[in-house]
Amino acid sequence: IGNVQPLWVIDGAIYEDLVHLSLDQLASGDAVTLISSAISGLNPTDIQDIQVLKDASATSVYGARALNGVIVITTKSGMRDTPLRVSYSTENTIRLKPRYNDFDLLNSQETMSLYQEMNDKGYFGITNSLYGRRSGIYYQLYKDLSTINPATGEYYLPNTPEARMNFLRQREYANTNWFDHLFTLKPITNHAITISGGGKNSATYASIGFYNDAGWTIADKVSRFTANVKNTFYISDKFTATLTTQANVRSQKAPGTMPQRKNNTLGVFERDFDINPFSYALGTSRTLRPYNEDGSLEYYRNNWAPFNIFNEYDNNKMNISMLDFKVQGEGTYRL
């Protein structure tokens, strides 16, 4: 599927996306989607009107680029012969954590019952568990059975039926709530100050805004500062000139990601080392634990390597900093 992005028109000027993406790419979660938006620096407080053009009139005005539709945004302007007005607005939002009750997923006891049946049929042998591409509690079991603790000179786990049973019982009742570990109740705050007014020959609209999302998950956060000044000059009864200056600074943190690829044989999309918090919480067994009893990180096997999601978030991340500055002029002459 080719490019399906609409054409953005803000105050008469066409805004191009930094990166043109297909529909599959837009939904991919790839890193490029975080820098592709043409309007990411536009403060919603500054928007006066939004129109969506989807018919033939869109292409007649804007050409072939408008085949996917046109979104026309008009920003606020100061009004002529009005007193100076200063306003402040704020918005604060808290998002709830996802819950396992909203999904039909196995708890740790149900998962362990399935694991034990598979183990009885020979699916969790020592070779596959220790050296396979992915392995969970049985990787940990065989690793502890075969690794000597340097502090004691003995194996981490004695090779006895009682020790094995105790190890598996701990995992059976772990019932790890990955949503609780990976998601937060941190707020989203949005502040905006606007100034508007005008005299006989000019009008001004100005705004500054600060947006801060402390992160719905432990792996992401974003903050943005915007500034906008729009001056309108009434040079004569027929001629009007407008000068708009916009600036925004964005700082963002996100979990690292590998490009998504399609498996045509299975008809599914795949991604190596996918650490998206929501996908991870949904797809990870609740028999696994994030920490050992001593508070250290507990690792299992993923893509042939020891893996812990918190270690990944500490070391596999994206820090994005963007500065955008725009100056736009417009002249209108009435016949």
Residue spans for each PLM region:
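Extracytoplasmic
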Residues: 3-5, 45-47, 66-70, 83-85, ...
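Outer-membrane beta-barrel channels and translocator barrels
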Residues: 44, 188, 199-200, 234-236, ...
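Short beta-strands and strand-coil junctions in structured, solvent-facing domains, enriched
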Residues: 1, 15-17, 56-61, 78-81, ...
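Transmembrane beta-barrel domains of outer membrane proteins
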Residues: 74-76, 194-198, 207, 228-232, ...
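N-terminal periplasmic accessory domains that precede
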Residues: 9-11, 60, 66-90, 170, ...
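Short acidic/polar hinge/loop motifs at secondary-structure boundaries
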Residues: 13-54
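Outer-membrane beta-barrel transmembrane strands
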Residues: 184-199, 209-210, 309-335
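Surface-exposed loop/interface segments of Gram-negative outer-membrane beta-barrel transport/assembly proteins
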Residues: 5, 80-175, 185, 215-220, ...
